[in-house]
Amino acid sequence: MRPVIVAPVPGVTSRSRLCDKTARVTSGGHEVYRSAACSTGLLLGLLVASAHADTPARQPARLVPFDLEAHRGGRALRPENTLPSFANALSMGVDTLELDMGVTRDGVVVVSHERGLNPDLARGPDGRYISAGIPYVRLTLAEVKKYDVGQIRPRSDYAARFPDQLAIPGTRIPTLAEVFDLVRRSGDTHVRLNIETKIDPTHPDESLDPRAFVTRVLDLLRREHFTHRVMIESFDWRTLLLVQKQAPEIPTVYLTQQQQPEENIYLDKASPWTAGFDPVKYGGSVPRAVKAAGGRIWSPLYDDVTAGSIAEAHRLGLPVIVWTVNDPKDMSRLIDMGVDGIISDRPDLLRTVAAGKGIPLPGPAPVSP
């Protein structure tokens, strides 16, 4: 899905432009070529992916071409949400760069998963890891740039989770504009960005309010001429409603997690995250709640989905992009279930699994950070 734009009227298949960029991939011992542009065209309704003659097994029907997303740039391989991680993902070949956004005290959009500096990642000028997080809304960009985020804190739980991550000391937190510059330098005119607003309604003091946050992001996207290359995701649905009103051309991706302790949605009661669109109002159905809110894509925790919920989302015209899947067995199972895309810390493994399923892969766009 690079990424997809799904029209409200199902049943019509169209692509907005000809296939003008090919990439060579290997599937079942055969070479398969695909146009990267084919997966970036505007999709007006239901697009059913057909199997290639050399495909090892018939693929399930999807609403859109499969979307291979590098979570935080592929944090199992390079420092997360940094120019090195995004450059590595582009050089490897992905459909979408997934990343997160915060806004500094002086109004600059920066790329970071937390709402502030992460003690497991950020080292000050003295070389020591910070002891507590500091929200970006309390720091200027100049202050943020003083911190080194190129190496996980040794012997931390985070380091144990990603033992293969290549440390790159001296790496700084990038601005979103710097990521756009990297994408331009790569020459990849088809890769898209799935950008998340990091706002927590239960901690309103740790970020801008939703309206101010969205305004900053949309102003930057328009100034950089990137509105056509992004989709905006969030667990805080208030921000997505604002995006839909102010920039309806940008697809909104509704993130959900039902599992404790970090759930943002409940099937039987209201949640501060869902802006009043609680599943309890829609027969306990998360896809119906997303559709009612105006969502274009549903992005659930992969453990939360079933074949039934995927089918229900597809009937509603909602592609399903699951997160965060790092085990090849889970990747294979979810692809067979018919998900429309996978967000992964291991885009390299996801490429291998997808190729084995006969899914055409995006071509590489080598670039240095």
Model-derived regions, located:
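N-terminal secretory signal peptides that target proteins for export/translocation
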Residues: 1-33
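Bacterial N-terminal signal peptides
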Residues: 39-47
